[in-house]
């Protein structure tokens, strides 16, 4: 007991003095920082301030990146304070087993510059394990002839703790026959032996019950117990005896399984059955049974499995020899294992800095590599190198530690990944080697700008495209990776106005597809150019530009538009008057049409669809000129109608129609009866108002009848027949030929006051059907005296509608037409630069004015309108001249009627004013006088 306590004290002193002795001789070993902690510390417990012990400033810790490099990281470094913290459970018994000194060695790495420090943490044992017996009950058979002092070895209790906390002593409960002794194996383990103090008498006590207790040295101590059941047997008084108590054997670790190790022999002086000995392992670890085999009859020991010096360098085998009388003897065998170069070196990558930027300079540290060989001596010396790549080398930083650094420029676009083979070779004979492959990924740097597939793009887009349709796609590639290679597209410039770019086109930032934001119109925009940019997502971003020219193609989407003949404001057709004596080839009129398209789509042709008298007129295919094909015959009607179609050259062609009303007459008097024959167009609005009035009248008949009666009485008292005063006594008015309402409206500065009967229910002008021989033509108009006598004013001084009637003057010479005013092709006359296209309203007003003026002149026989060969009857082409503003390709299709002559206003003369020009503002007096 005293010897065991002395050894424990020596171990404690060594644990205390060893760090102190190492500090006195710093040059003897590499610089290493040691800490001492108890096992089973809580996680994040502070071991010590590693930064302070290494001489590192706390301010430099983020830059130095101090960290622990170990295969199993029991510790970690606080990056802010530099404290070494416990990061995992530390169980001394699991890590070091029964070793008296448990040290955890690991490395710490600091960067900028790169340094490696060696750290050792001594793990101190705590009393966290209770001594335990393998069996809760031990059965012994002892012969009654056994002499006092005989010992019986017992299975020891197991305590995983070491030092003072390990198993310290055994004690047996008080009894009369047995005592307890403590023994120690060569490796220092304690086991109990039961000592017989007095001779046994089976007849007196055949069974003895004992309690064995194992106690450790902890504070407080822990203990474990087992029961010993001793059965007293009959006499077999000679136990087996081994030739020696301890055997020693040396083996190489490369011996094969089944290799003979040793044969033990025991003798028994008994005879017969009591002398038969059986051998068995006694009180050995399972590891011993795994590697060694014992023949229970012969005592021969052989290897059972491959031995490994790196796992265990020695084994202790306890052998028991027992006879049939359960008498036994014990011996131990010490087996020493010799090292052989059977372990290849190991390559351990402790840190890999991946991915590596492709612009890293030579000498950049990529990885930290550690080598290890479990063999000893020369077999454990290792040399390391990189195979087959000239851009990387290994630099030795300390024993068994290397840095993998770059030795050349890198290009990710050329080689995005490296598989580096690192080989380690030991110094054994023959040498063993091993290798490991380190995969190094090269990270991308934005060093490549996007590149378009074409230097420029040109696309053709047909007009009237649907909005949102794709019209082109541009594509650019970037060999960079990730965001550096992700290309986005945008429009950066255009020959369009800045505000119009987004309304015309847009580009998809991801796909590069160019979309039309609106339907293109070839007539408005024939081509435009965009500057598109491809930009990557790098920092800084790189970009490239390309031009895209968009040509808008023409479609036949515009039908021809007939400018002449035009319809009146109420939809009525105009008339052209042709002299009866017109010769074949006489230019009657010209159909004028335009097409907003271009090219063949605007090439117009003119065709006669229908004619009231086929063969009487001919139509120019390209000019639209209507000429007489033959002279007017006696059987030909005076009124002719031509339906003309105007077609363009598109596919399919579009067309428009125009209706020409031609009248063969030598004077305007012949035209007026034809005009009166036309039916008055129905007024849907008037009919609707009529039905509304009827409906309202049915609801309140009595009220409306009273109102109508009152109004009628008032009108009868106050009405004056102003219209009848305009004529000579004896004349009467009756409804005559009706003129279309469009002839009573206009913008020309003339007033035509026609006498209207008060009983007339019609709203149009009525001409008097008068015999020229009885009454002069000038009597149709009111003279000044008659007008003055019949002028009435209301109570408030406001003149009545009849007060606005003025005397009409005969037309001046501006209504005579010269040869230059006859129709012709475009460009035959010098057009007025300020002229505009004629419209239906203007044509109607001109025809209205000419009809009324002709009616006035016809009364005195002085009219020349329509009577001469050089005139064109009632055609509206004698209005102010205009200039066509159209594409120059088809000017021959444009007809410019009329002239620039300024019309002299007869009313203006009467008022003392200069006559207004043909293009001036014209007073619409027709409607007012009609009212």
Swiss-Prot record:
Instruction: Give the residue range of the signal peptide.
Output: 1-30
Provide the GO biological process annotations: cell adhesion; homophilic cell adhesion via plasma membrane adhesion molecules; nervous system development
User: Per its UniProt record, what Pfam families does this chain match?
Assistant: Cadherin (PF00028), Cadherin_2 (PF08266), Cadherin_C_2 (PF16492), Cadherin_tail (PF15974)
Q: Where is the composition biased (Basic residues)?
A: 921-931
> Which residues of this chain are annotated as glycosylation sites?
419, 545
- The membrane spanning regions, by residue number, are 692-712
Matches recorded under PROSITE patterns: CADHERIN_1 (PS00232), CADHERIN_2 (PS50268)
According to the UniProt record, where is the region Disordered? 814-840, 901-931
Q: Kindly report every residue range on the membrane side named Cytoplasmic.
A: 713-931
Read off the InterPro entries from this record: Cadherin-like_dom, Cadherin-like_sf, Cadherin_C, Cadherin_CBD, Cadherin_CS, Cadherin_N, Protocadherin/Cadherin-CA
The record's PANTHER family line, in alphabetical order, gives: CADHERIN-87A, PROTOCADHERIN GAMMA-B2
Q: Per its database record, what is this protein's job?
A: Potential calcium-dependent cell-adhesion protein. May be involved in the establishment and maintenance of specific neuronal connections in the brain.
Q: Give the protein name, as stated in the record.
A: Protocadherin gamma-B2
Q: Which organism is it from?
A: Pan troglodytes (Chimpanzee)
Q: Give the encoding gene's name.
A: PCDHGB2
């Amino acid at each position: 007991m005293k010897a065991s306590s002395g050894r424990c004290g020596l171990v404690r002193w060594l644990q205390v003095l060893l760090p102190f002795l190492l500090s006195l001789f710093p040059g003897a070993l590499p610089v290493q920082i040691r800490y001492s902690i108890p096992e089973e510390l809580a996680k994040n417990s502070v071991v010590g301030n590693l930064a302070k012990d290494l001489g590192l400033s706390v301010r430099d810790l983020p830059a130095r990146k101090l960290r622990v490099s170990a295969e199993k990281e029991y510790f970690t470094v606080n990056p802010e304070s530099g404290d070494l913290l416990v990061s995992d459970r530390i169980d001394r018994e699991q890590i070091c087993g029964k070793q008296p000194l448990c040290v955890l060695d690991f490395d710490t790495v600091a960067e900028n510059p790169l340094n490696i420090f060696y750290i050792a943490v001594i793990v101190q044992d705590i009393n966290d394990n209770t001594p335990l017996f393998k069996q809760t009950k031990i059965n012994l058979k002892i012969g009654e002839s056994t002499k006092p002092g005989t010992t019986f070895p017992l299975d020891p209790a197991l305590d995983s703790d070491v030092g003072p906390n390990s198993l310290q002593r055994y004690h047996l409960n008080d009894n009369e026959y047995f005592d307890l002794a403590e023994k120690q194996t060569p490796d220092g383990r304690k086991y109990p032996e039961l000592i017989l103090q007095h001779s046994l008498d089976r007849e007196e006590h055949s069974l003895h019950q004992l309690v064995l207790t194992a106690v450790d040295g902890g504070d407080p101590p822990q203990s474990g117990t087992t029961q010993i059941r001793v059965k007293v047997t009959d006499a077999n008084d000679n136990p087996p005896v081994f030739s020696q108590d301890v055997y020693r054997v040396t083996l190489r670790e490369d011996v094969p399984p089944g290799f003979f190790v040793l044969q033990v022999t025991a003798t028994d002086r008994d005879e017969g059955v009591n002398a038969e000995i059986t051998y068995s392992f006694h009180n050995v670890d399972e590891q011993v049974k795994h590697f060694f085999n014992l023949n229970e009859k012969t005592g021969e020991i052989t290897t059972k499995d491959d031995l490994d010096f790196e796992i265990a360098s020695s084994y202790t085998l306890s052998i028991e020899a027992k006879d049939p009388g359960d008498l036994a003897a014990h011996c131990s065998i010490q087996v020493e294992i010799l090292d052989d170069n059977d372990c290849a070196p190991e390559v351990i990558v402790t840190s890999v800095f991946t991915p590596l930027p492709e612009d890293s300079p030579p000498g950049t540290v990529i990885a930290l590599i550690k080598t290890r060989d479990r063999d000893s001596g020369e077999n454990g010396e290792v040399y390391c190198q990189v195979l087959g790549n000239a851009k990387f080398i290994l630099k030795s930083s300390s024993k068994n530690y290397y840095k993998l650094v770059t030795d050349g420029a890198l290009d990710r676009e050329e080689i995005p990944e490296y598989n580096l083979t690192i080989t380690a070779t030991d110094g054994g004979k023959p040498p063993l080697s091993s290798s490991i492959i380190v995969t190094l990924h090269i990270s991308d740097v934005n060093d490549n700008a996007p590149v378009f597939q074409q230097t420029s793009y040109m696309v053709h887009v047909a007009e009237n495209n649907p909005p949102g349709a794709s019209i082109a796609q541009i594509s650019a590639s970037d060999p960079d990776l990730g965001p550096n290679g992700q290309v986005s597209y945008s429009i950066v410039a255009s020959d369009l106005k800045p505000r119009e770019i987004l309304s015309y086109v847009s580009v998809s930032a991801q796909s590069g597809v160019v979309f039309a934001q609106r339907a293109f119109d070839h007539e408005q925009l024939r081509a435009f150019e965009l500057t598109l940019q491809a930009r990557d997502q790098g920092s800084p971003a790189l970009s490239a530009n390309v031009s895209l020219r968009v040509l808008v193609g023409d479609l036949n989407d515009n039908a021809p538009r007939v400018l002449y003949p035009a319809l009146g404001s109420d939809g009525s057709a105009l008339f052209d008057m042709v002299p009866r004596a017109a010769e074949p080839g006489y230019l009657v009129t010209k159909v004028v049409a335009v097409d907003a398209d271009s090219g063949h789509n605007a090439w117009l042709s003119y065709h006669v669809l229908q004619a009231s008298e086929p063969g009487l007129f001919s139509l120019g295919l390209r000019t639209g000129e209507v000429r007489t094909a033959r002279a007017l015959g006696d059987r030909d009607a005076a009124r002719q109608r031509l339906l003309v179609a105007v077609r363009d050259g598109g596919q399919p062609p579009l067309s428009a129609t125009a209706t020409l009303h031609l009248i063969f007459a030598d004077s305007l008097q012949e035209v007026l009866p034809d005009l009166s024959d036309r039916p008055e167009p129905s007024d849907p609005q008037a009919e609707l108002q009529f039905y509304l009035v009827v409906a309202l009248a049915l609801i309140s008949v009595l009220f409306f009848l009273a109102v109508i009666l009152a109004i009628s009485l008032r009108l009868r008292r106050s009405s004056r027949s102003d219209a009848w005063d305009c004529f000579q006594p004896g004349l009467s008015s009756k409804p005559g030929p009706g003129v279309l309402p469009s002839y009573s409206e206009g913008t020309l500065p003339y007033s035509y006051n026609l006498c209207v009967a008060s009983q007339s229910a019609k709203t149009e002008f009525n001409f008097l059907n008068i015999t020229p021989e009885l009454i002069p033509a000038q009597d149709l108009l009111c003279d000044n005296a008659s007008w003055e006598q019949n002028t009435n004013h209301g109570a408030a001084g406001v003149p009545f509608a009849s007060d606005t009637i003025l005397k009409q003057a005969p037309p001046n010479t501006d209504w005579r037409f010269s040869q230059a005013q006859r129709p012709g092709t475009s460009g035959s006359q010098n057009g007025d630069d300020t002229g505009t296209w004629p419209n239906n309203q203007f044509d109607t007003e001109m025809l209205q004015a000419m009809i009324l003026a002709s009616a006035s002149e016809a009364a005195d026989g002085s009219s020349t309108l329509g009577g001469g060969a050089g005139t064109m009857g009632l055609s509206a082409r004698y209005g102010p001249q205009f200039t066509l503003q159209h594409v120059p390709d088809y000017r021959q299709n444009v007809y410019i009627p009329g002239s620039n002559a300024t019309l002299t206003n007869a009313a203006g003369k009467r008022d003392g004013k200069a006559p207004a020009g043909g293009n001036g503002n014209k007073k619409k007096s027709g409607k007012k006088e009609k009212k």
